[in-house]
Regions:
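ALDH superfamily catalytic-core signature
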Residues: 1-103, 122-126
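Short, surface-exposed loop/turn microsegments at beta-strand edges and helix-strand junctions
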Residues: 112-113
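Glycine-rich nucleotide-phosphate-binding loops and adjacent flexible coil segments
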Residues: 116
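Short, solvent-exposed loop/beta-turn-alpha elements that line the ligand-binding surface or hinge
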Residues: 109
Length: 126
């Protein structure tokens, strides 16, 4: 779980190698979502200069607005199971967000968000 959370939310998800989607297979799906939410709920948020910070601010106002739009879209394309709003005041902070969807063609499942939003989908098998 730490590797998924770090990949999805480190650098506020602003890296090309960020995990944007996770697929849970069969009976592990519910446990996967529960564990992801638990781990993302305690990721340290803050200024990038603080050593304990795992999720800092987005790069600029355009990025902030884009990610907030995707968070709003996520409510129509899936179930938002975690949206951290305990972010520092001021700046372009967006907390980790975990969304579950059963729509593999949803925008939140197919577009590059480049922010701290992780989409989780279920698969019956490989």
């Amino acid at each position: 779980m730490p590797a998924i959370v770090a990949s999805a939310f480190a650098y506020a998800g602003q890296k090309c190698s960020a995990a944007a989607r996770v697929i849970g297979v069969g009976p592990v799906f519910e446990s996967l979502v529960e564990r992801l939410v638990g781990a993302a709920a305690v990721v340290p948020l803050g200024h990038a200069r603080e050593l304990r910070t795992a999720v800092g601010p987005l790069i600029d106002d355009d990025a902030y607005r884009r990610v907030r739009e995707y968070q709003a879209l996520a409510r129509t394309e899936g179930e938002v199971v975690l949206q951290r709003d305990d972010v520092p005041a001021g700046g372009w902070y967006v907390g980790p967000t975990v969304v579950v969807t059963d729509r593999p063609r949803a925008r939140i499942a197919t577009e590059e968000i480049f922010g701290p939003l992780l989409t989780v989908m279920r698969a019956d098998d490989f």
